[in-house]
Amino acid sequence: NAAQIIVCDGNFHGRTTTIISFSNDQNARKNFGPYTEGFINIAYDDLEALENVLSSSSNIAGFLVEPIQGEAGVYVPSEGYLSKAKALCEKYNVLFIADEVQTGIARTGKLLAINHENVQADILILGKAISGGVYPVSAVLANDAVMNVIKPGQHGSTFGGNPVAAAVAIAALEVIQEEKLA
């Protein structure tokens, strides 16, 4: 189990034990633990740091990034950062994982923040806004290369496949499309 995931300083991906393991927010980490290993922190919006880590280890499985950092103070990356980061991930055969919980579903003028740079994530994390804020819904979407690794019965959740949540999410997405909100 030598696989590692690159994450960015100032990130916010939630408050579970694994996630706070690589958080810089000491309030989130205080009084919790033990922490999960396997994460490498780099500066946000720093392509040189990303390539340095990618080129120095064959154990990197993914790069997890918020297209726009929210909790850190709403940091918008330099133009081209996301597309160049995605290209580096492809070069080193590493998954590009976009956490769009705070930015997704038309919050930035496009359906997804990564759409501003025509980036397609290998794994896309969505939440909150996918239902228009009226029902708790989240989703993890991935390409075939990722999803075909998971066999039926290997992954699940207590509330996965909730038909009410799915109907609400579909209705919210239809409104966004019909009203051209993204």
Residue spans of the language-model regions?
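Conserved N-terminal phosphate-binding loop of PLP-dependent enzymes in the Aspartate aminotransferase
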Residues: 1-182
